[in-house]
Amino acid sequence: MLTIATLHVALQVFGAFSPSHAAAVTLEHRSARDGNSVAVPANWDVYGYLFNVTVGSPPQNITMLSDMTWMAPFVRSGRCLGQFNPELCVAQGQSFFNEHNSTTFANTTFAQATWPVTAFAPNFTVDYGRDKFCIGEICNKDTLMQVSDFPYPGSVVPVIPFGGIFGLAPTPEAITATSEPVNFQAWKNGKMGPLVGWHTCEVLKSAATCQGGDAQLVFGGTDTTMYSAKKLQSYEIQNPEWLSDAFYPSTPPRSNYWSTSLTGMWIRTDKLSKNYAVPFKAVKTAKRTPPLAVVDEGSEGLGAPLSLNGYKYLVRHIKSAKLASKAIVQNIQQQGSSGYNTADQDWYTVACDGLHEYPDLVYQLDGRKKYTISAGDYVTKLTDMPGSVCYLNINVWKYGRTENGDARVVLLGRAFLKRKYLVLNFEDRSFGLAPLRTG
């Protein structure tokens, strides 16, 4: 989930996984010096994938939201309005980290930071502290983390089913301590390797490889039973200066997303459409540049990515496509199966059968490998409607649009990732994709 996206969701009850469910799997390491690995299951919630860690001494269980665009770890605390007062600062039912119950917690001299707009709370204000942070059995002492200190009582913030955010964004080229994810800090201290492996079990016959969850994260390595290393295509991240202001102005500017150039985006019927990955001028004085594709495993990127112009072309080439009624649009939004910040686009219903006749969506990253999303992964059934009602689950992302209907940024989310194994490499600042073994 992009850190400053606007969410309007109904809260759901989440059965958190215990850290004891972390398991040993067949893992890949870059070298023996890189340290250990641990695999943990994650469960899907309307906000994204959630999993458990422990923080402090003695350990406190904290359910974390996985976020590949967040940086240093964040925990809800008993602080607000510049004071420690859990009764005032934490709403009833909200989980949080109680620093006063940890013998190893320490404040730091890093300046307090505030983000005026976020998905979770306005004027999102944090202090910085250090404490022991464990993923499964792998622990890193003195992990630097964001500790909430909102400028209002806890009752202002809705109760959410997690007590922290586990940032998985790559570190910027100019690394600062406050931009380092938990696993990066642990890798620097020799506790684990520099890789993070990720896959979802959505298209698999069972959830065994996700330890009964919806997805599995491997910290410090990858699960080599789920992909062939020979088929892994890696991409060095590309974070041009204009990307930092593409969504929301940020000070200092952000330059750390898992992103690469999108050099091809086609709709394939009996032939390929024109290429909808249209180069554009990011700034008036610059040369034309290809749009970017940003990896986002969370609730922003659920649908298959297209530009508005590409979406219109797709609709024209599906005979059963009809503009959805207001009632159906409401059901789409309530079901939570499509990305947020798509409110400006039209929605279309389509026939639920004959998907093999629908077009494929084809993408090319950085002038190299091409990837395909078939109709079975971009046509979604509405579960709370009588009869069989399906719709085009396409993400024309609000913040990636250009005025003429092209896209400057698309999100590689669930529809794109569900049949792939994803490798995040924090040492090389690259990400890799390989076909997910489904047998």
Swiss-Prot record:
Gene Ontology CC terms, in alphabetical order: extracellular region
GO biological process, one term: proteolysis
Cystine residue pairs: C352-C390
Entries under CDD domains matching the protein: pepsin_like (cd05471)
Membrane-spanning segments: none
Subcellular location(s) per record: Secreted
Main location: secreted
Record's keyword annotation contains Methyltransferase: no
Enzyme Commission numbers on file: 3.4.23.-
Molecular function as annotated in GO: aspartic-type endopeptidase activity
Keywords: Aspartyl protease, Disulfide bond, Glycoprotein, Hydrolase, Protease, Secreted, Signal
SUPFAM superfamilies listed in its UniProt record: Acid proteases (SSF50630)
Domain Peptidase A1: 49-434
Active-site residue list: D67, D296
Glycosylation sites: N52, N61, N101, N107, N123
Keyword Repressor belongs to the record: no
Signal sequence bounds: 1-22
PANTHER family: BETA-SITE APP-CLEAVING ENZYME, ISOFORM A-RELATED
Described function: Secreted aspartic protease; part of the gene cluster that mediates the biosynthesis of the mycotoxin fusarin C. Within the cluster, FUS1, FUS2, FUS8 and FUS9 are sufficient for fusarin production. The other FUS cluster members are not essential for fusarin C biosynthesis.
Name this protein carries in UniProt: Secreted aspartic protease FUS4
Gene source species: Gibberella moniliformis (strain M3125 / FGSC 7600) (Maize ear and stalk rot fungus)
